[in-house]
Amino acid sequence: MEIIKRVTDSRKRTWECFVDRCYFDMYCVRVEGDRNFNSQLSFHFYTVNEAIDFMNLLKESH
């Protein structure tokens, strides 16, 4: 698994973005190290731009 980008939010959580080969090759954004398949902190996007935009929102949110 190749990490495309990492960001840290205001709660000091590190988020990672990668291509999820097991989920239709969609881009996944999740808390680093979270391996729970049913995690509420795992988000899938169709394009890398959508995933990066979401990560930027996470980084800027309070």
Regions found by a protein language model. Name each.
Residues 27, 57-60:
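Extended rod-forming repeat segments used as scaffolds/tethers
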Residues 1-31:
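Short N-terminal "domain-start" leader segments
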Residues 7, 33-53, 58:
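A short, exposed loop/beta-hairpin motif centered on an aromatic-Gly-Thr core
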Residues 1-2, 59-62:
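Short intrinsically disordered terminal tails
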